[in-house]
Amino acid sequence: MRKANVIKGDMIFQWKYGFYMLYFIIIVIYLVLFSFLNGSVKNTIVSICIYSDPAAMGMFFMGALILMEKSQRIIPSIAVSPVTSREYILGKILSIGIISEIVGIILMVQRDSGNHFLCAVGIFAGSVIFSLCGIIVGTKIESLNQYIIWTIPFEIVGFVPVIVYRIGFLWNERIMLLHPGCSVMQLI
């Protein structure tokens, strides 16, 4: 029950600060852009957008959440609350994962092909990976500028191999599946 309350609290916090409105605007923009595409180009671009936004935006939203909680002095109060650090992190990951999954499914139905179940698994896995990266970076920094700078290495490692893999340069190379992002993209 406590875990559900932590997730609910995080989702209310996200709603209060406009995360859901931002996602709604992003979805509308993507749907308009996707309406101009067709065929394999559309499928590739939709797959990259599913990976980069619902999955990877978890890193940026997680950082924003942690910075807001730091500025409001919420994090020190967790130490004396009955919520464990494991429940706190799990609540963050699941709350971001839920919104990522919803957005990803909306984008996923824009493709002409693909396994929807595996795509949903990939979206959630990507969200978890990038949310954990966001927690790692978010706990080490004090300002938004620091956060943006510290996420650059995560972005390079998380995006460049995946985009190269997805657009076909190394699509048939099984060794690329050792990269967690490429494995997520394979599912998507």
Locate each region found by the language model.
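Short alpha-helical transmembrane interface motifs in multi-pass membrane proteins
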Residues: 55-60, 91, 114-122, 168-170
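A short amphipathic helical element positioned immediately N-terminal to and/or at the very start
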Residues: 3-15, 187-188
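Hydrophobic alpha-helical transmembrane segments of multi-pass membrane transport/permease proteins
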Residues: 13-40, 44-62, 150-162
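Terminal transmembrane helical anchor/hairpin motif
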Residues: 161-188
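A structural motif at transmembrane helix-loop-helix junctions in multipass membrane proteins
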Residues: 18, 124-164
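Short helix-loop junctions at transmembrane helix boundaries
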Residues: 108-119, 140, 167, 187
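Hydrophobic alpha-helical transmembrane segments of multi-pass membrane transport proteins
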Residues: 42-80, 84-105
